[in-house]
Amino acid sequence: MPDPSTYRPAPGSIPVEPGVYRFRDPHGRVIYVGKAKSLRSRLNSYFADLSGLAPRTRQMVMTAAKVEWTVVNTEVEALQLEYNWIKEFDPRFNIRYRDDKSYPVLAVTLNEEFPRLKVYRGPRKKGVRYFGPYSHAWAIRETVDLLTRVFPARTCSAGVFKRHNQIDRPCLLGYIDKCSAPCVGRVSAEQHRQIVLDFCDFLAGKTDRLVRDLERKMTAAAEDLDFERAARLRDDIGALRRALEKQTVVFGDGTDADVVAFADDDLEAAVQVFHVRGGRVRGQRGWIVEKSGEPGESGEGQLVEQFLTQFYGDQAELGSAGDNAGDSGQDEATNPVPRQVLVPCLPDNADELTEWLSQLRGSRVALRVPQRGDKKALFETVQRNAKEALAQHKLKRAGDFTARTAALQSIQDTLGLADAPLRIECIDISHVQGTDVVASLVVFEDGLPRKSDYRHYAIREAAGDGRSDDVASIAEVTRRRFYRHLHDTQHPTELSAEGKSRKFAYPPNLFVVDGGAPQVNAAQAVLDELGISDVAVIGLAKRLEEVWVPSGSDLGPEPIILPRNSEGLYLLQRVRDEAHRFAITYHRSKRSKRMTASALDSVRGLGEHRRKALVTHFGSVARLKEASVEEITAVPGIGVTTARAVLEALGVPQAAPADSGTAAAVIDDDQRRVTG
């Protein structure tokens, strides 16, 4: 482990201006990013007294091998640069406020001719308007089910919409008037879009206008003696009011605000946010984070600053991704940064943080501590939620952590390892009768899957022509994986643009193969060949769940049988089963691509779009084979030269061109079609 004194900057070399700094490990990876009003004061605090640092900060300083800094003009610039660097490098020692679950949102696809309402998780898309997040998907479905009585918008997928359009008959929702059935032409595209826009206005908080419009229409219908329509409008008004009743009014002045509260202990913190729009609570989110314990920083003020920077920076990016100049433009109720942000305390750089938030919003943002009245009462409610979330997390983690610790300790004791296997890697081979032979490698750290480090391998040397050798495949994958590790170790400067290793950053403590003695010995032979002696190798056989060790091991030639109730065996089974699942998924993908391949794939210059157009036009490859050149060129984008190449690939003999002039004309015609 590096000695901090070896990379400590020389006295007087650090500037006193504000700036942003980053620590790098011996491989050049960025492991921590921070900012400071005075770079000299802050960086010196890391090296003055290591024993006085928080454990996490001390570990960071001991892991690092280099520190760099960038001087900026203002603290607002430092705030923005720190956010950008954390986003770019994802340093392992920085707090990252990631949701404790993937919260669903209600997406309205305004970029489609007939917009659709749907539950959605994932990155924001241009031309789509989002509402939420909601705590559960069923809450979205319940809201949509209630409001489609008043706003009968489309909720079906593209396939269902197309099918009912073809049979000219609406679905059940169309028959019960919960969909305006644009698929069969009951309403025009413009009428349906207006229904969807009214739906969006209601969710955005513009409720009074919509209710008044319905009341006016109900009165007019009653005056015209159209009592059936008046009764329906009365029921619609009741449905809207029931929806409003579910959103309790917390601020009588119709305020837009986010209320943020924390609960923390020495190691972790829980944060809860209530999103209030138009005076009503529209959503709630929660996070659990590990505290950094950065020197010279107050606890809660630091949490407030880091959370607001990361959360609203991310939200502004999502908002711009989903923004569109047309129908999906942001309004007051959907702007990711509200007019007010209520927090438990103001950070030291509150003025700079407020200025940055105002820039994100496009207008003034108020950062305040609630003191009395409704805002204080709601803040206390949010704080109770944060305390409850932290208590539940600690209770759950205590059970999970105890089990994982017991599992790792069991494996260490059973195999006689010097340390607990904090990083476990497992490989598995998958094929069907020697075809599409692939391998998977999965990684578990601290007993939990680390999916960002998972890898697929297509077997090159140990398979082919319908043959497969599992033992040779294990050896090939082991060699490829650890050759990369040796390459990274010998060339530590070869990093990606983000400062990360291009492949694997760290070797495993334990390498698991799916199989028995032959597979284990094959993997061990590769490690011996490469000169790697600090990685333990075992095999886990499915029969009796035996744990095999390499020949010549001090543990003896016989397999080890772990107790059936052993936490260590349970962890090894989960690792092995995850590797098998990952390999099967990749194998099925490769096999599906191979089985769906056709003779058209070999036609030079014929891409997927035009292949699909040909098959769609003729109905099948067999019918395409019977077509003439003239019939094929009737398909948009297909010229004479391409048509001849298609027929040649399908085995249809072609007559040679009559002369060079004709050939030139054909080529010219084909070029005109492609460029057109």
Curated annotation (Swiss-Prot):
For this record, an example GO cellular component is: excinuclease repair complex
Q: What is the predominant subcellular site recorded for this chain?
A: cytoplasm
For this UniProt record, the keywords arranged alphabetically read as follows: Cytoplasm, DNA damage, DNA excision, DNA repair, Excision nuclease, SOS response
Query: Mind listing the GO molecular function terms for this protein?
Result: DNA binding; excinuclease ABC activity
Is the keyword DNA damage assigned to this protein?
yes
Pfam families xrefs = GIY-YIG (PF01541), HHH_5 (PF14520), UVR (PF02151), UvrC_RNaseH (PF22920), UvrC_RNaseH_dom (PF08459)
- Residues forming the UVR domain are 208-243
User: InterPro entries from the entry?
Assistant: GIY-YIG_endonuc (IPR000305), GIY-YIG_endonuc_sf (IPR035901), GIY-YIG_UvrC_Cho (IPR047296), Hlx-hairpin-Hlx_DNA-bd_motif (IPR003583), RuvA_2-like (IPR010994), UVR_dom (IPR001943), UVR_dom_sf (IPR036876), UvrABC_protein_C (IPR050066)
Superkingdom of the source species? Bacteria
Function of the molecule: The UvrABC repair system catalyzes the recognition and processing of DNA lesions. UvrC both incises the 5' and 3' sides of the lesion. The N-terminal half is responsible for the 3' incision and the C-terminal half is responsible for the 5' incision.
Q: HAMAP family, per this entry?
A: UvrC
| UniProt similarity note | Belongs to the UvrC family.
Subunit structure of this chain's protein: Interacts with UvrB in an incision complex.
Write down the NCBIfam families for this protein, in alphabetical order.
Answer: PRK00558.1-5, uvrC
Question: What protein does this entry describe?
Answer: UvrABC system protein C
Q: Which organism is it from?
A: Mycobacterium sp. (strain JLS)
Q: What is the lineage of its organism?
A: Bacteria, Bacillati, Actinomycetota, Actinomycetes, Mycobacteriales
